[in-house]
Amino acid sequence: ISANDMKKMIQELLKKHKYDMIFMAAAVADYKPENFSIEKIKSHKKNISLKLNQTTDILKNIISLESLKIGFALETSDGEINAKKKLDSKSLDYIILNYANEENAGFDSNTNHLFLYSKEGLKKEFILDTKYRLSLDLIKTIIKNEKNK
């Protein structure tokens, strides 16, 4: 499935259904090869180069006036700065930040350590916990924050 295919599917779902919250956890792919080959690339060449083109940014292009848009930012440095830039550039209501280089968090782990930011300035840290408990805490926090507006 390509990023364009995914974008079309999401747009169709948003036309047919109303969602309170839209969580977009990760990009399908940020880049795709410029040229595709249906043939096997032979291994006789020691090195090859691929030219990559940026794919459609699905999250940035979702337009839903009735749904909260919530994105994720996986960073290795300058996390808060980069997450807040993404919050603004993609017109999100909330962004959830985690670090790829943090031990016992993120990929290959059942636990995570997160930060939640809102477009209104909310900043909340969620200490290391199971991903299941964190997901419940995130939803509760977002609902509470929305009710307090």
Predicted regions and their residues:
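A cross-family phosphate/adenosyl-ligand binding-site feature
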Residues: I1-L74, D78-K149
